[in-house]
Amino acid sequence: TGGSGLKSYELHPNDVNDIGMICGGQVTVYFQLFTPEQTEDIAVLRTWRAQLSRNVDLWLLLALDGERVKEFRVLTRGGIPQEKKEYFTSRAIWHGGVYTEPLARAGRACIFGGGHVGRALVPVLANVDFRVTVYDDREALAKPENYPAADEVVFGSFSDISGVTLTADDYAVVMTPGHQADYEVLAQVLRSEAGYIGCIGSRGKIAKTRERLLADGFTDADLARVHAPIGLPILAETPEEIAISVAAEMIEHRAKRR
């Protein structure tokens, strides 16, 4: 209870501010009280909520003068003040009374094919902060209720995915129900700016798809963009295990980009 302010805690047994931790160290926490009268601050929170669905890089900026808030804002990349640019990274930073924290990162995972593996993959990715779009040409599958953790479900033809724009921040995961559809989607995805491209399948299937793409004019450099077979080699067999393997590779790719 009470107002806003800084509070320090000792993370090891002690007689002052002991919170029962045994790992050691110290943590300082800033508590921000929001009341209905703080209309400007409430507006910032509403902006924050609205921006989360816009697929943009988003940061919190909190500047303190002692324990008084000088500045409380939510910023996209284009709104970052030039003099504070060094504070806006992929990590939370506290320096000289200025605290910044990344709230959202641009980029979504587009899963082309919502079958058994796709359905298992959606909640795994959502739980590690990927925004997820599922794209399928089967009307019975392409329904939001089949993927409650997905941000978007699209019903469309695999031969024409032009309704989905892939940027350099996006992840394309190809796991359609057939070889022909995999080929069609890959041929289109390779012409996009997608930052990550992965395709499920056996090594034999991947080799045949690669041959077709090369025959169509794609280069070895183009195909080097494709993670295939997709996923880290953890000997996964079930859809749920494969989903973990795929998500792990995507997490690794995301971490290396930071």
Predicted region positions:
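Adenosine-phosphate binding glycine-rich loop
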Residues: 176, 194-195, 200-258
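Rossmann-fold NAD(P) dinucleotide-binding segment
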Residues: 181-194
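Segments forming oxygen-rich coordination pockets for charged ligands
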Residues: 1-137, 141-151, 167-171, 205, ...
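Short amphipathic alpha-helix with an adjacent loop that forms part of the alpha/beta core around
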Residues: 158-168
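Short, ordered loop/turn segments at secondary-structure junctions
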Residues: 137-140, 158, 178, 201-205
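Conserved SAM-binding strand-loop segment of SAM-dependent methyltransferases
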Residues: 151-157
